[in-house]
Amino acid sequence: MTAEIQYPLFRVFVGPDRTITICGSQIFTLNSQSGAVETLATVSSAEKNVSSVIRIGAVDEAYQHLVTSGDDKRLRVWSIHDLKELSCREIPKRANVLKLSQDGQTILVADKFGDIFSYPLVPPESTLQPQSTENTGSKSLAVAMHDNPHGTLILGHASIITDFVLTHGEKQVISADRDEHVRVSWYPEGWDVDQYCLGHKMFVSALEIPACAPSILVSGGGDPELYVWEYKTGKNMARIPIWNHIQPFLKVKGGRRKPEKPQGKKSKKKKAVVESEDVDMVTESGEEFLVVSKLKQVRFGQVDVVLFFAVGCSALFYFRWPVSLDFGGVEVCSLDLANPVLDFAVVQDGKVLVSVDPTWPTTPGAVSTTPSTDSRRVRRLVWKDGQVVEDESESPLVQSLNQGCDVKGPANETHTLGLYEPLFALPKTAEFESGDGAEDTPVPQDITSGPGLRASARQKTKEELEKRKALTQEATQRATKQPRVEET
């Protein structure tokens, strides 16, 4: 019988009154001062044989609402104070990135299809009505075609969107994808592209606009450097080398994802080179890959610092933000935490809580199968003497996160949590370079299944964007066009 182990905390959000943590399909709220666990909620998948594990989450700035999504393609909104599920909406494709607008009233979702949709926090009543069971074939086709009557299409990429950020005035949205692109578009008129930040050689997986420098963008992904941009002009200001700092701390190696070869007789038709939840994939682990997962500018007293980590890496990295914007002298530092970092959250008192994975030796691609000697799932860090160091004292909240919030499962099933999925999903192979669905894919007349359906759906997205653009241009021709107000 397989032994059970305590699963790690995938996401942590620390608010002034309540802290939220996500583990598998369970959500916990804790009192941020006492650490007492106040509420527990469990997500159940609406479909058979579909995982109920929560993959992504986001909270509003006021810490009133939590938004989550997972493999079941449901967008759930929760009330933080009692973890009541306020709404549950079906979305066309699995969500990849979730963000909330500054006022907390709009949810922005980037999906595996390469599009960003916006949804109102409180859905219209019609959205909550049960779906009719009649004509289920048409419904399935509509979902596959990426029809989304409940969401507003903002923009679309020809590749999976890996991250996006709204600028500090929410006048623009900056989006990145698996095909090395960083695009600056007007928001919410996302079809109106203002600028490109070009230069990455590999996928881009993390973006950050520092609050201390709102006209600058920092991006990272699979390249051995972080890129610093003047995003309004697309100018690359600097590149900060990071790979030599990260490589010694890699605990989980990545791999490449390829379409699974069909069993039995070989098909005469070439299998579609489309990476999605509609194609069976196999993974090959054992290669070192860099995937920058999160970038965040933090202020410690009077010092601005950029924190970041990489998937499968056991250290938290940081550098001081240069006031002079001279990045030539930037020194990248690291703090070894022994176990791979999963997430970090900034606490109001200037401390940082870091979630780590003590179960990593059980995951595919682990560099060692020897169990970790440190079972702590959360560490608290502080800024001291010009460095990020571990806090010598352990708060009641950290104690509760480490000892409570107990979610156990078989040791051989930690891979189902998807903690290291980007290490396998983002790198490309020569045979799979078009893995996200190229725009020039021919569209056959029969679009009821297979690659034709995917290509037709992408073409439909493009047509929808063009239609919106044409309507807007027509409207501006009938009225005096007002100049756009640039952000300062």
Residue ranges and their predicted role:
Residues 30-39, 77-87, 113-151, 169, ...:
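Per-blade loop-tip surfaces of WD-repeat and WD-like beta-propellers in eukaryotic adaptors/scaffolds
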